[in-house]
């Protein structure tokens, strides 16, 4: 009998030991598995980054989740209590799991024959939201419990509550209590009332169902329930609860205005962060950065709105596209960039898409280098003839050739033959070297590049950047979209400090500016209206499939403040899709964008120690000449020559004498219509003529015939 009693006593001891052992193993497993499952990086809540323009105004937020993490100390006590009251009233008593709630949930799950009720504590919800999926399975619930227990071991209750409130989803793309406070009440979380806190606490259970915007009645009903629970649990008095329940929801929803005009610019900001500063798009979306950009919001919006107007596009249908970019002359920062008429985020950005630049290339590849190399000047005469260079025969667009024209006129009227002739004179490699210095590196080797005939082309951004060199007195600065990037701690992790490099002299740049002004005043860029100084160049390329069709149309130019380039055409040109007119349309568009943005009335200022480019001397034929003998002192004869002088007193007149069939240059005078030859011989038989001379072109004009002096004029 004693043995039987001993045996009965031994069995419970064995069970107790085994239970203790299994409990120990379970506890160790929870600790080990909990730490194994927890990825502490996930506890670092992502914050949205913001983009601010040149005035410091926020223009966009970048985020995967619209979230603004805050410290627990910034969240009012009664707001915290509203969430505790409804989500986990024993939060400060349990160690990760609430046995009573779990028991109730298990009982209801058994009755339902499956997993239907959560019974989760705030810590468990935090574990689920950060580390686990949202499926309702017993395995997921087990992991949730394990992680929750370990979170309770590693973090204080206040820290857990802080993380919980910062990761909750409040609907409408808003994550975290601070972002929710901004969105629904347009105020800081620290300024929330108990009623407003209850409004927010009502949302997370079913963000769509209890949205105070979509379903205000349902939200108010749940808010009032939460206020009642706060009273029941001793957080507020009955009077406070009744007073709060009597209030309206008090929403002051922050307007989330759609700003599609910023989309193409923002995409270029993200691209530059990746390419230039090795900050990935994902990092920008999650890092809480402040990205300062040189954006001019007014100019950006104006360009977007103007470019949407169909009247600017001479296409075969309404689907012709366009792109524009504008750069600050002082900094080189991009103030506006439009990637398309209906650009969508992450779409085909035509700001960086390459196209054939046409005649906009002439100042960059030909005339700028020609002046800088001191081989030609603005009024140097260039050959304007139909001639072939091997198998390449460039033609003027109007098929008219003048034999010789000045560089200034060749640019003003966009003549092709002189441009190709000049490039041939200075050398293709010379032209390419200047293009490369201006940010355009191309493989093309032929003379066709004088006219923008390239294998691939250039982008509006590249073209604007290159023209900016002239506007910046000959210094090239690579266009940029990011001024600086500041992290959450206020540290500057990226800062634009690029120094420009000298490409053209100030004199060359000023001469080019003056010539390009003539293009706008009387040349190919007269279309449209602009009040203020503007220098620029048109360009277009032909579509050979249809007679008279245009493939690409351009205007690139600059004011004293802004440089820009506008392109228009089709993404794919074919027999049914082409422009029916050329560069006059982007020229007018360019002018209207700046005018409507208020960028008018500015005047170019000549740099110090730079000579002004004189206006061209336009010689008229000298047709009338009189030559008479006159008496002077001591009875000597003087020959007096008189002719019709030019209005331009800079004109020089050469006096030629012909004696015995031999012509000799006797003298020259400037700005006069008369000349005297003293001590004349009445019997010399000499005759005289006058020929005008242009000191700019180094060429003579049309002069008079030879005339013999008369002793007595009638």
Swiss-Prot record:
InterPro entries in the cross-refs: Beta-lactam/transpept-like (IPR012338), Glyco_trans_51 (IPR001264), Glycosyltr_51/Transpeptidase (IPR050396), Lysozyme-like_dom_sf (IPR023346), PBP_transglycosylase (IPR036950), PCN-bd_Tpept (IPR001460)
Membrane topology qualifier: Single-pass membrane protein
Residues the record marks as active site: 87, 359
UniProt-annotated stretches for the region Transpeptidase: 297-592
UniProt-listed Enzyme Commission number(s): 2.4.99.28, 3.4.16.4
All ranges on the Cytoplasmic side of the membrane: 1-12
Transmembrane segments: 13-33
Domain of life of the source: Bacteria
Record localization: Cell membrane
Similarity comment: In the N-terminal section; belongs to the glycosyltransferase 51 family.
Function: Cell wall formation. May be involved in outgrowth of the germinated spore or it could function in the synthesis of the germ cell wall.
Protein name as it appears in the record: Penicillin-binding protein 1F
Species in which this protein is naturally found: Bacillus subtilis (strain 168)
Name of the encoding gene: pbpF
């Amino acid at each position: 009998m004693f043995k039987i009693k001993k045996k009965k006593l031994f069995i419970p001891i064995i069970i107790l030991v085994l239970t203790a052992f299994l409990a120990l193993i379970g506890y160790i497993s929870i600790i080990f598995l909990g730490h194994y499952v927890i990825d502490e990086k996930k506890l670092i809540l992502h914050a949205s980054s913001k983009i601010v323009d040149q005035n410091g105004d926020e223009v966009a937020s970048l985020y995967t989740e619209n979230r603004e993490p805050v410290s627990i100390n910034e969240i009012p006590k009664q707001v915290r209590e509203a969430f505790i009251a409804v989500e986990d009233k024993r939060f400060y008593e349990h160690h990760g799991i609430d046995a009573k709630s779990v028991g109730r949930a298990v009982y209801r799950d058994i009755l339902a024959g499956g997993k239907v009720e959560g019974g989760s504590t705030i810590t468990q919800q935090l574990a689920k939201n950060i580390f686990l999926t949202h499926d309702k399975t017993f395995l997921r619930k087990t992991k949730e419990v394990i992680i929750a227990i370990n979170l309770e071991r590693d973090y204080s209750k206040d820290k857990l509550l802080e993380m919980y409130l910062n990761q909750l989803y409040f609907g409408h793309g808003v994550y975290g209590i601070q972002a929710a406070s901004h969105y629904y009440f347009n105020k800081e979380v620290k300024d929330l009332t108990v009623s407003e806190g209850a409004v927010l606490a009502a949302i997370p259970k079913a963000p769509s169902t209890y949205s105070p915007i979509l379903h205000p009645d349902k939200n108010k009903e749940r808010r009032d329930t939460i206020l009642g629970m706060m009273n029941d649990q001793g957080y507020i008095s009955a009077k406070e609860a009744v007073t709060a329940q009597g209030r309206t929801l008090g929403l002051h929803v922050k307007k989330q205005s759609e700003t599609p005009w910023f989309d193409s610019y923002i995409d270029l900001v993200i691209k530059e962060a990746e390419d230039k500063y090795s900050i990935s798009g994902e990092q920008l979306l999650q890092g809480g950065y402040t990205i300062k950009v040189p954006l001019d919001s007014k100019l950006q919006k104006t360009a977007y709105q103007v470019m949407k107007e169909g009247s600017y596009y001479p296409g075969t249908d309404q689907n012709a596209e366009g792109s524009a970019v504008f750069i600050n002359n002082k900094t080189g920062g991009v103030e506006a960039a439009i990637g398309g008429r209906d650009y969508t985020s992450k779409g085909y950005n035509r700001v960086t898409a390459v196209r054939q630049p046409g005649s906009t290339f002439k100042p960059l590849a030909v005339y700028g280098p020609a002046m800088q190399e001191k081989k030609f000047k603005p009024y140097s005469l260039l050959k304007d003839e139909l001639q072939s260079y091997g198998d390449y025969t460039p033609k003027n667009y109007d098929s008219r050739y003048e034999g010789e024209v000045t560089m200034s006129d060749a640019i003003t009227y966009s003549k092709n033959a002189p441009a190709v002739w000049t490039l041939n004179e200075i050398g293709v490699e010379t032209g390419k070297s200047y293009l490369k210095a201006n940010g355009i590196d191309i493989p093309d080797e032929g003379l066709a590049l004088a006219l923008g005939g390239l294998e691939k082309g250039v982008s509006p951004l590249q073209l604007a950047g290159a023209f900016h060199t002239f506007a910046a007195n000959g210094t090239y600065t690579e266009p940029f979209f990011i001024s600086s990037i500041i992290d959450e701690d206020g540290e500057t992790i990226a800062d634009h400090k690029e120094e420009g490099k000298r490409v053209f002299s100030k004199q060359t740049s000023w001469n080019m500016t003056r010539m390009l002004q003539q293009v706008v005043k009387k040349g190919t860029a007269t279309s449209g209206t602009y009040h203020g100084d503007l220098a620029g160049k048109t360009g277009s390329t032909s579509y050979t499939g249809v007679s008279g069709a245009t493939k690409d149309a351009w205007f690139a130019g600059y004011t004293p403040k802004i440089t820009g380039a506008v392109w228009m055409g089709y993404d794919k040109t074919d027999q049914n899709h082409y422009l029916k007119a050329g560069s006059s349309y982007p020229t007018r568009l360019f002018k209207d964008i700046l005018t409507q943005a208020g960028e008018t009335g500015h005047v170019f200022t000549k740099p110090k120690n730079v000579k002004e480019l004189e206006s061209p001397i336009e010689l008229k034929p000298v047709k009338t000449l009189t030559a008479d003998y006159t008496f002077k002192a001591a009875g000597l004869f003087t020959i007096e020559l008189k002719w019709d002088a030019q209005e331009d007193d800079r004109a020089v007149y050469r006096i030629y004498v012909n004696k015995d069939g031999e012509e000799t240059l006797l003298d020259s005078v400037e700005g006069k219509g008369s000349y005297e030859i003293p001590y004349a011989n009445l019997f010399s038989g000499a005759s005289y003529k006058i020929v005008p001379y242009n000191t700019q072109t180094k060429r003579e004009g049309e002069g008079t015939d030879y005339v013999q002096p008369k002793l007595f004029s009638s």
